[in-house]
Structures are given as structure tokens and as C-alpha cells.
Amino acid sequence: MSATKLTRREQRAQAQHFIDTLEGTAFPNSKRIYITGTQPGVRVPMREIQLSPTLIGGSKEQPQFEENEAIPVYDTSGPYGDPQIAINVQQGLAKLRQPWIDARGDTEELTVRSSDYTKARLADDGLDELRFSGLLTPKRAKAGRRVTQLHYARQGIITPEMEFIAIRENMGRERIRSEVLRHQHPGMSFGARLPENITAEFVRDEVAAGRAIIPANINHPESEPMIIGRNFLVKVNANIGNSAVTSSIEEEVEKLVWSTRWGADTVMDLSTGRYIHETREWILRNSPVPIGTVPIYQALEKVNGIAEDLTWEAFRDTLLEQAEQGVDYFTIHAGVLLRYVPMTAKRLTGIVSRGGSIMAKWCLSHHQENFLYQHFREICEICAAYDVSLSLGDGLRPGSVQDANDEAQFAELHTLGELTKIAWEYDVQVMIEGPGHVPMQMIRRNMTEELEHCHEAPFYTLGPLTTDIAPGYDHFTSGIGAAMIGWFGCAMLCYVTPKEHLGLPNKEDVKQGLITYKIAAHAADLAKGHPGAQIRDNAMSKARFEFRWEDQFNLALDPFTARAYHDETLPQESGKVAHFCSMCGPKFCSMKISQEVRDYAAAQTIEVGMADMSENFRARGGEIYLRKEEV
């Protein structure tokens, strides 16, 4: 925890300096590589961790070494992870997907914005200093066309996005030759299909079946294609966003870049304060990962925070505004039905979802059905025109372990399954949001219920938190549940930071939440038996046994913390080549002793073997050459 608390002015200045001096930066001893596909422009970034050789013998003067293969890993950092790319936040990122979108010929540029709110913001000269300067001209589908990845998949079309994803999901594991590194324990996949090699056709088939989604708004061409589905690597989402009491555009852009650097596969902008529209534009134009939002938050701002004053018209305008900016997925709380609200009355913690409570209050005050449910087909029509995926929100998720798996939670889940089928009628991609607070023994039921009632659409959960007693450590309490539900089949995990239930996360909190959830996601991939998931673990274990300290730091999810903790005990440079670990010291290091035992055993085997051969030689008469019948 920081010893000195920065003022608001200092925080903004620090964030401004961060984005003004931003450069493409590689992790220690890593380099950016690209693997090209067969379709034009498919060039998939990965991070390759370079390793030092292993000492295998020789003398002090002439040591003998064996090279260790570089380890390729999935990289979400986009251009921010490539030192060869010049970064300019004022201009935004290169439009990677624009040629693919244009080549399909099914979109058209809009001469005027569809949202009245957007028109008003653009006409306000007072916002010029805040506004992102390089605004895109938004596109939408031509009349009678659908531009979603689900639509293309159902037509049998393998898009460049699908080929990009296939290469990315394989993580370059075909480059690894060592049998030691390729060794992997069998997993327990709970029905997931995990092919040894992911092809573009497999990606297309999973998307066509609704088991996976590719969040890829046609107005967010800067994003690098990624996929969310239980038959792929488990993904992690990070939440950022300003509020009425804290943060600024500079700080949110800083948190976006920071999130992608530390492994966020998607980022949700949950802004509720001033300048939501302008903040989101800066985020989208500088984001290499899909961006999600909860549109009801901004719609509520438009009616001065009074839930009862919300209207379908205000919400529709917000959807159009955000779709034309480039938001890749919307969280929509359309499953909070009027008849479900009384089911929460006996709960210990009631309705804890912000979106869920807004819609529950609206339903009760008007005594009408949820207008998101009533207008769901119109929502789907909008999404189909821009390829905005739907994340069907769990507005009635449990907010305490006591309320887990109750009637209200599962009633809403079943409704989300009904809405999924409606969205699929419009070729709109769908994932399902899940809890929440659930004790460990009750977690698996959430996954089985979702698979059965939501037709195997991808599941996306907040944790779940497995206990309620650890404020300040809820990244741990939820990381446990996240690892479990990821193993059972959850496709994406929404991170929880140490500030959960306590305050808004800062930059360091974002990192802590992401590292925790990258651990959970990776543990789930290992448990499922995802092909290649164990390569990095094996490389780390080999480096650890061989006392290759620099390689251990560099293979870590957080090399900087690993190095810092080691250096607290062994700060000298000699400590980084020492053949003992920093915890046990030279005489009690278990791995050093194991190496000595291995060397001794090998020597003993040779000695015993030579003695046996000597005895055999004497028994045969001591002849150098054997008779033919003795061979």
C-alpha cells in the first residue's frame, strides 16, 4: 500500500504524464513476434519470453550449455507491447480491422449520427478541449444486411477475425519441440471440446453454434480479434470507469493501457460521472481489446439519476450513441422481471446489482414489465446493425453467500435463456452473466444450470466470491471461485480488485485484480486440460530446478514483483546466479539437494554397472572377443 496518498491534482498530473510519455514496452527479456495467416492482414501478435541456456557440464574454463527454447505466450497489450510501434494517444491506435470490414461490402458510412445525445455533444463547443480529435465516421449495416460474426459463421464464412483467433488461441505452441515442455497432465473438461489444434473452421463452428462470441463492433476497428467460449482459453475482464466523485479521462486511459499490459482480454467502461461520452471515445480509440458497457448507467445520467424517469426512448438513444462509438458488448438487464422482484424480499442482501436495482425500482414504481424485456427485439435489431454482442446481465445475482442459488437468481437465469434464443434469431452474439457470492460447494450448479437453460452460450461471472469475511482481500475470495467455475466451463471471469465493496480501484488495484484473475484463468485451463496450457509451468519448473533465476523472474506473470521479492533476501547480483534458493540458503535448499542426489544416483548407476560388466567379463573367460554363439 502506498505510504503517501496523492491529491486529485497529483493523480491527474501523474496520469497525464503516463499517457504523454507512453511507448511500446516489452516485458523483461521478452520480444514481440507476429505469426501471419493466409488471409490478407492477418498478423497475430504474441510475446516470446527468451530464456538462458542450461549448464550441462564441462569445466569452469570451458562450460557446456544446452539452449532452452523461447516460450510464446498470449499477449493482450496490442501496440503497447511492441517497442517498434510509436504510440500517440491523441491519434489513437491503427485501424487493424478496417480493411476487413470494408472488404465485406455490407456496411455504409453514416452522414449524420443516429443519437440525439451525440448530436448535442458534438455541437457543444465547450467540449472541444475534452473531445478526442480524430473522430471516426461511424458505419452501420446496409439495409437488409447483418454484419455480425455470428451471421458470417452461420453462412459458412471464415472471416479474417476467425483466422486471427485460431492462430492466437494456439499460442504458438507448435513452435515448442522439447518433450519436457510439452508434457501435460490429462484434464477434466466437464464436456468441453478441446482440440489439440484450433483451426479457423473450429472457431467458425463454435461461433455458429452460439457456444462462443467474437466481440467486434464494426466501429471499433482498432481492436484485435479475440474469442469468449468454454472451448477456448479462459478470458479475464477488467472494469474501469470514472464516477461522480473521482477519476478523469487521463486516468481512465491510463487504466485502460495498464489493464491490457497486465492481461485484460476485455475491458468494461463503467463510467457514471461527468463526460461519459468523451471518456468512452478516448478509451475506444486507444483500446486493442473489446470494450463493454452497461448502457443503463448512462441512460440514468440523462434523466438526472432518477430511475423512475427512465424511458425506452432515452435508453434506445444511448444504445445508438454507444454502438456508433464502437462499444463491442452491452450488458443488458432484461431478465429482471416484475414478478421476480418480490422473490428477493427474503434475501439477506436484497438486489446488489446496480443495473438490476435500477430496473427493479422502475418496474415497481410504474408497476409495468421491464422495458428492456418488452423492447428486447428492438435491442437486437440495433446490435445486429453494428455487431454489438449482448452480455445478458444478472441483475438478481446474490450479494452474499446466504443468498446464493436462490429462486430469484435462477428464475432470472432461465429468462436469460429465453432471451438468448431471441437474440440468435437476429444473428446477435450472446453471453450470459453470472454471480456473485457463492460458497464453493454450490458453484458447479451455476455452471450446469447455465449450460442447460442458456443453450451453452458463454458464461461470464463476477468471481464468484466464496466467502464474505474478507473486505480488502476479495480478489482472493473471488479468485478461488473464479478458478473453480472456470474449470467447470465458465468462458470469461470478471476481475475483482482489493477495493471491492470498499472503494473505486486505482491503477495498482487494477494490476492486483488482474494478476489474481490471470492465475485463476490459467489454473482453470490447466485443470480442463487445455492443450499447451502447461508449457509455461514446465518451463518455470525447469528454470527453478536449474537455478536460472533470471528466467524464473521473466516467466512469471509479474516479473517485477518476483524479482523484487527475491532481491529483498539476496540483493547482490551474485544471488541471481546462486545455486540455492533465497528461502532455504545453500545448505538446506531442497532443489540443490535433489540435484546432488540425482548426480550421485547417476554416478552410482555407472559404478555399479561397470562392476557388473567387469564380473561378467571375468566369468566369460576374460576374452576380448566372444564366440559367435555367445553373442
Curated annotation (Swiss-Prot):
- Gene Ontology MF terms: 4 iron, 4 sulfur cluster binding; carbon-carbon lyase activity; zinc ion binding
User: InterPro entries in the record, alphabetically?
Assistant: ThiC (IPR037509), ThiC-associated_dom (IPR025747), ThiC/Bza_core_dom (IPR038521), ThiC/BzaA/B (IPR002817)
**Protein name, please?**
Phosphomethylpyrimidine synthase
State the Pfam families in the record.
Answer: ThiC-associated, ThiC_Rad_SAM
Q: Name one GO biological process term.
A: thiamine biosynthetic process
Q: Does the keyword Hydrolase apply?
A: no
GO cellular component, alphabetical, reads: cytosol
* Family label: Belongs to the ThiC family.
Query: What's in the keyword line of the UniProt record?
Result: 4Fe-4S, Iron, Iron-sulfur, Lyase, Metal-binding, S-adenosyl-L-methionine, Thiamine biosynthesis, Zinc
Q: Which domain of life is it from?
A: Bacteria
**Where substrate is bound, by residue?**
239, 268, 297, 333, 353-355, 394-397, 433, 460
Chain residues that bind [4Fe-4S] cluster:
581, 584, 589
For this protein, the parts annotated as crossing the membrane are none
